[in-house]
Amino acid sequence: MKPVRRSGGQAVRGLLAGAVLLTAYPPNRLAAQGFPTTPPKPTRLSPARFPPFQEVTLPNGLQLVIIEHHEQPVVSVTLSFRAGGSYDPAGKEGLSALVAELLTKGTVQRTAEQLAATIEGVGGSLSASSGDDFLTVSADALSDQVDLVFDLLGDVALHATFPASELELARARALSALALELSRPASLAGRFFASEIYGRNPYGRSATRESYTAVTRDDVTAFAAQRLRPGGALLVVAGDVTVPQIQSLVEKAFTGWRGAPPPGPAPPAAPVKRATDILLVHRPGSAQSNIVLGNTTAGPTDPMYYAGRIATQALGGGADARLFLILREQRGWTYGAYASLHRYRGLGYWQATAEVRTEVTDSALSELLRQVGRLRTETIPDSELTAVKGFLVGSFPLTIETPSQIASQVANAKLLGLGDDYLRLYRERLSAVTALQAKAAAARLYRPNGLTVVVVGDAARIAARLRAIAPVRIVDVDGKPLTAADLAPPAPAGPIALDAAQFATRTDSSNVLLQGKAIGYTVSDVRRSGDSLLYVERSSLGTGAFEQRTTVLLDPADGSVRQVDQVTAQQSQRAETHLTYAGGRVKGQSAAPQPDGSVKRYDIDTVLPVGTLDENAVPFVVPALPLGPGRSFTLSCFTPSENSQKTLTFKVGGLESVTVPAGTFQAYRIAVTGSRVPFTMYVSTETPRRVLKTEFVGQPFVVELVK
C-alpha cells in the first residue's frame, strides 16, 4: 500500500493542530493525567449469542434447518447440494459451474428476465454458485416477502429449463473469465498448486477452454437431474420467520420432489510426496514471481484443526503475522505474504503465498521455508499467542451478525459434518489452544520433507538460484515441460512467407461491443494502389467520442510495411502519425491522445530487426500467415503510439465453429501474447481469410464481424 499523500495545506493544518495540542497539554502534563502505558489485559470471554435452531429431515431426505432471528426484518435461504466441481466428469470440468449459472436463467413458468425482475422488484436477490464440494442456491429478501422467496426457490430447483441460448451466453462468460484468470500469474500459481498437491483427485482439476467447450446442454440437464435431488440436500432458513411458517412454505414449494443423487465414485488418493521440490512455471519477461507452497492436510472434522488454525494465523493470517511483517515490513520484498488453512468435505490443505520481485525470488522462498520451520520447532511466545487468539475469537461474532451470515455459517458446519455444537463452542475451543498444541499441529500439518512449491515467474532469471534450494522442474504456462535451452527469449523469425491469396480486395465491417452491447464500429478495406497494397481501417466509438483512420501501405510481394498514416480524434484532442519503413528503419512522427487530455508525441528514427511489422498491420497480416492447428509464429512489431518494439507470439489452437453477425464459420483460434493486453483472434479458414472476432483478455471489449 502506498502512503497517503496530503496536500501542503492539509499538512500545515495538521502541524498547527499538533502544536495547539502540545501547547495545551505538554508531555509532562499528559503523563501526569495517568494515561496507561501498556494495553489492558483481555477481559473474560463472554459467550457469543448464537440463536438456537431447529432441524428436521423431511420424508424426501431433505435436511431442513430453521434459525429464528428476529433482530432484522429479513430472511436468508440457502439450498445446498452435493454437486460441486468435484463431481464434474473428467474432461468436462466447469459443468457444475455452468449448471449453477443456468439455474436462474429460466424455468417452465418464468424467463430469466422475469425471474430477475420478480426478485429485484422486492429488493431481494436470487443466485446460484458452485464450489468444490457443493452447489448452492441462495435467496435473500425482506421477511414479508418470504412466500415469494420460496415460490422462486422451488421454481428454479424443480423446474429450471436450462435454455440452450443461455448456455451459450454462460459458456462465453466462462471462457472470458478463464482467459482473464490464465493471464494472471497468481491464478496460474493456484491452478498448478492444486494439481500438484491433489494429482488426479477431483480437487486438483481445473476447468479449461476445452472442458467448457465440451459441455453440451444434455450434459447440463443430466447433471441437474442426477445431482440436484432432495436426498442429502440441505436447506437452511435464517431470519425474521417462525418454524411453522417455514415448514408450511417448504411443503408447498417442494411438493412432489423426490429422489437422491447416486453415490459418486471413490476419488483417487492425493499423491504423497517424500521430498520437497519446486515446480517453476515459466512466464517470460515477468517482473515478479508468484510463490505458493503447502501440502494437503486432513479431513474437516480432524480435532487438530483448532491448533492448526492458531498456528497458521500466526504464520500468515494478516498484516500483523510473521510472513507479512518479515517479507514486507522488514525486507521490502513484497506487498503482502499470507498463509491459510482450508477445509473441504474431503482432504483439505494449507498454503503460504507471496508475490515478490524477480531478483529476490530465491531469498523470499528461503525465508518462507524458514518461517514455516520455526512454527514446527518453536513454541509461539505468550504475547503473540494471546494476540492471535484474541483476533480469531474476537472477530468471530462479526461473522454471525446477519441472517445471511448465520445461514452461511450453519450451512458450512452442517455440510462439513462439524457437529451441532461447532458454532457454539468454536471460540472456546480456539481459546483453549496452548502454545505446545499449536507447535504440535504445525509439526503435523506442515510437512517439511514433502512440501509442494510452485513459482510462476521468469525461469530464465530465477531457475539457477532456485536449484540451490530444492530440485526444480520447469514447465510453460500450459504445463508443457521445458529444458534450459527452451528458456532463451524467442527471437523474431524474420520475414515469414505470407499467402498472397489472402490479399484479395474486400471490405469488412465489424461491431465493437462493450459487455455485449454495441458501442461503435470498425470498417477495413483492402485494395491495390499502384505497386502497393492499401489497408485502410476506420473506427468510431461512443457516437463520435473517438474517431480513428489508419492507412497502411504494404509490399504485395511479402506483406512488409512501407508507410503508415494515422489520424486520431478523441473529443477535443487530435493526433497524427506519419511513418515510413525502409532499409531496416522506421522514421517519422507519432502522436497518441492520453487519458489526462494531453497528446504524447515522438520523433522516431529507429533501427528495426528484419521483418518487423507495424502493429497497425496485425489484423491485415495475421490472416495471411501459414496458419494451421498447433503452429506458432513470433513476429517483431513496432508500436508507434509508444515508440517501442515488441515481440508478439501467435499460437494457433484447434479449429472452432464461431458464430458472429456475419454468419457461422470454421475458424482458427489464435492466442496473441507480448502486447500490453493479450488478445485472441478468430480467423476464418476460407480464402480469403477474415478476422471474425477479437477478444481482449481481462477486458469487456469484443470486436465481431458483421459483413
What name fits each language-model region?
Residues 7, 25-27:
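Intrinsic disorder
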Residues 33-41, 203, 234-299, 457-491:
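An aromatic/glycine/proline-enriched structural segment found at the starts
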Residues 28-32:
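Sec/Tat signal peptide C-region and signal peptidase I cleavage site
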Residues 42, 46-80:
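Mature N-terminal segment immediately following signal peptide/propeptide cleavage
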Residues 13-25:
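Bacterial N-terminal signal peptides
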Residues 65-67, 71-101, 110-158, 171-179, ...:
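M16 family metallopeptidases and their MPP-like homologs
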Residues 1-9:
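N-terminal secretory signal peptides that target proteins for export/translocation
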